[in-house]
Amino acid sequence: MKSINNNILNLFLLAALVFTGCSEATFLDEQNPNAITPDTFWKTEKQFTSALSAAYSALQFQSVSGGELQYEFVLGDIAGTESWYRPNAFRNLTFNDGIYHVTDKWNELYIGIFRANQVIEYIQTAEDSEFSDNSKAEIEAQARFLRAFFYFQLAHTYGGGMIHDKVASTDAEFSKPFSSIDDINSTIIIPDLKFAKDNLPQTWNAKNQGRATWGAATSLLGKVYLYDENWGEAASLFKTVIDSQVYELTRNIEDNFQHENEFNKESIFEVNYSFDIAPGVNGAVVDDSAFESGAESSAMATAVGQLNFGAFNTVLPSYNLHEMLVYDEVDTENPINDDNIESRRMNSTIAPSNGEGLYYQIPYTEARGWGFGQSAYVKKHSNWYHLEAEPAQNRSGINFRHIRYADVLLMYAEAVLKDSNDYTTAIAYIDMVRSRAGVITLQKYMDDNGGSFPQLHVSKQVHGDHPLVAANPQTVLTHLQRVERAIELCFEGHRWKDLVRWGIAKEVFDELHADEVWRQTNFSTLVVGEAPLFIAERIRPDFVKAAENYSPTQHNYFPIPSGEVQTNDNLNN
């Protein structure tokens, strides 16, 4: 969303600082009748709409929806990196309170919170007559949704945060104590989302694509309850979204990760980026300044795209993810398939050395890469499907989807499983996602195997086969946690939060490290050309340090940035 009027909002802060630094006489002598102040700005619907656009623009920050998410992608079980890349500190769990991204995300989320707070606070005293129809309530509802979204990200990245529900103007108001996730939920997130749910439309017209909707607020509220293990409330909200028939799965899963067919029927909350606006500006630049306009672009593709095609591949699919996608078995009876060997889900997610079709407009056999233990590259969020190389200056116009319908279906399956052990219903909703991917459903596996299905997260390369397990609440939950959410939603910002809330990070790291040890020991047999992973030259050690270093108290959440600790009197006393 275009970053408009950010300079106006920054003037408010500047004016406040100037006022506190001048004597009363000087201030009275040097009034500027043309100056924009809170008393003159926060009046009309147009002014509030402009300020709301600035709050939306905070979604484009690279740590929120763009290239800096690479650091979070490598935290869990779906990805690794190389030792010379910056994400390695997150892969090895050696990050600290002063490192990039830990500080960037904190700062950028609070910028978003500040901008939303401005709209929420000042609209309370705005005259109703200045607004048309329901626009006043809709503007407040959008701002409250955004504030809730930013606080959800803050709470589940840092384990809590400082609650700012008003625009701070004094040192005392800036220095707040650290509040828990529960406190943030009850004080900010849940009330804001309930208000948003009750006051937002189901859909907007084409001119307003990207604005928060009833479905976004309801889905995020359900997610809040899911994370809080309030299973019944979560299930009820997800089912309301499902039954609304506003959303559906796209026929082609790749429509969710490319610049074509954006804001489609599967999209519930999506952040808009553009390649064409502000050409020449680096994609990492978000806000307008006195020197240049914000890029409106994402730097994500430069991070995840392949090194030989103008990117850096700082995020690499883990062998575990690669192997699960290899065995994401195509259902030849599903009409979505057309003699393809790879599942639609695999083809839109990763690029193995033996991939199908074209990759950056050339056959895989002509492309370079896949050496030094790099068995696959990330396709999702990159421009592999329509360009010969990633654009210069970190620019990509691919939107980022924070909430999509497939996620809601899987969260609903989890909620009913945990609430009532109803694994039959859970399987039905998991299979909706699997069917769209064109792969064999759990139900079909069960029909063919006497009520059992394979544990696809267990490495067939390492352990010889996928064990068959009878369907029951626990085995279906394990499949949902280790397989379905991992491969359907990988590189979308959910995985580490999932592993943390389930409490299985240590178990997963230990298992995947053991698989690495086996591959190291048996490396002489894992030569180029051998299925399923075609690993060349070495085994990449993604999980040796993670398994060794992981501590829930140290790594489940990022530390409070050192700068906040040093300046916040309520933290350093």
Model-predicted regions and their roles:
Residues 1-33:
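Bacterial Sec-dependent N-terminal signal peptides
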Residues 22-70, 557-573:
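Membrane-proximal, proline-rich intrinsically disordered regions
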Residues 45-53, 57-63, 84-158, 174-186, ...:
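Conserved, well-structured interaction surfaces
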Residues 46, 61-63, 86-94, 98-107, ...:
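Elongated scaffold/linker segments in the mid-to-C-terminal portions of large proteins
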Residues 66-84, 164-166, 200-220, 226-296, ...:
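Short, surface-exposed recognition loops and adjoining beta-strand edges that mediate ligand/DNA contacts
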Residues 231, 422-423:
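TPR-repeat structural position
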